[in-house]
């Protein structure tokens, strides 16, 4: 992943990307607050977790930030209640659109205009003790074993 800050750096970035594989994705950079939101649904309820804010001193939340401790994860996120609710509603809607099952996690950037922008959908989010979902589960006052039991029992009923 390369962040290009000036036009003269575009071609070298593209060349570098092609040296890694046959396809290249070019995206606009969106400056803002990065947040992530977990969600699951059963036949009789919807659970949308508190948001986690992702803060890093790196250019963006990359491999080093994620796996080498160069990130601060703040749950619940330090954003307005209105923005939180908007992200949670959007996460629930994405869950339904995808026909998801079990847990998902959706990542967003909230730029200066306050309108959340979808980054990616994680249909198999990390589940280690330090992953986002377990942090959000704890922030919601729940236990992972209860969440997992809920999801598993729903599939058998």
Mark where each language-model region is:
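Phosphate-binding site of ATP-dependent enzymes
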Residues: 7-89, 115-117
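Flexible, glycine/proline-enriched loop segments at strand-loop-helix junctions
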Residues: 1-4
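ATP-dependent carboxylate activation and anion-phosphoryl transfer catalytic cores
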Residues: 80-157
């Amino acid at each position: 992943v390369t962040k290009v800050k000036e036009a003269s750096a575009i071609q070298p970035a593209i060349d570098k990307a092609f040296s890694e594989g046959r396809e290249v994705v070019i995206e606009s950079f969106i400056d803002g607050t990065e947040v992530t939101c977990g969600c699951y649904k059963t036949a009789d309820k919807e659970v949308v977790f508190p948001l986690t804010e992702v803060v890093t001193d790196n250019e963006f939340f990359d491999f080093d930030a994620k796996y080498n401790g160069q990130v601060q994860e703040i749950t619940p996120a330090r954003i307005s209640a209105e923005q939180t609710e908007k992200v949670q509603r959007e996460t629930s809607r994405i869950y339904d659109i995808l026909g998801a099952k079990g847990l998902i996690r959706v990542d967003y950037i909230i730029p200066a205009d306050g309108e959340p922008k979808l980054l990616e959908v994680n249909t198999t989010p990390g589940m280690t003790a330090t992953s986002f979902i377990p942090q959000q589960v704890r922030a919601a006052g729940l236990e992972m074993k209860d969440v997992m039991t809920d999801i598993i029992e729903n599939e058998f009923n």
